[in-house]
Amino acid sequence: MARVKRGNIARKRRNKILNLAKGFIGGNKNLFRTANQRVMKALCNAYRDRRRRKRDFRRLWISRINASARINGTNYSKLINGMKNAEIIINRKMLAQLALNDPKCFEKIVSSVSN
C-alpha cells in the first residue's frame, strides 16, 4: 500500500488560519495554536456583532428622533403614533437623517402629526 503524506494538506490548513490572523499582535499572528484560538474568537465576535449592529443602529436612530422630537415639543412615542395615524410612512433611519440634516422638514412632519 502506498504511503500517505499529508504535509501539503496540513500546511494549507495552518496557512489558512495564519492568513486570517494577519494584523493580530505578537504570537497571535505567528503561532498556530494561539492564532487559531484568536481567529475562532474573532469569527465568533464578528458573527455576534453583525446581528448586534442592527440593534445598535435602531437604538441610535430612535435616540436621535426622540431628541429632535422633544425640541419640537413632543416625544418619540407620540410622534411615531401620530405618524401611523396620519399614514405617513417614513422609516426610522430616514426620519433620523431628516432630524439630523434637515430640521425644518422634520419640524413640518412633527407639526402635521400633532394637528
From Swiss-Prot:
Molecular functions (GO terms): rRNA binding; structural constituent of ribosome
Family in the record: Belongs to the bacterial ribosomal protein bL20 family.
One Pfam family named in its UniProt record: Ribosomal_L20
Protein name per Swiss-Prot or TrEMBL: Large ribosomal subunit protein bL20
Function: Binds directly to 23S ribosomal RNA and is necessary for the in vitro assembly process of the 50S ribosomal subunit. It is not involved in the protein synthesizing functions of that subunit.
Taxonomic superkingdom: Bacteria
A GO CC term assigned to this protein in UniProt: ribonucleoprotein complex
SUPFAM superfamilies listed in its UniProt record: Ribosomal protein L20 (SSF74731)
CDD domains in the cross-refs: Ribosomal_L20
Keywords per UniProt: Ribonucleoprotein, Ribosomal protein, RNA-binding, rRNA-binding
Biological process terms in GO annotation: ribosomal large subunit assembly; translation
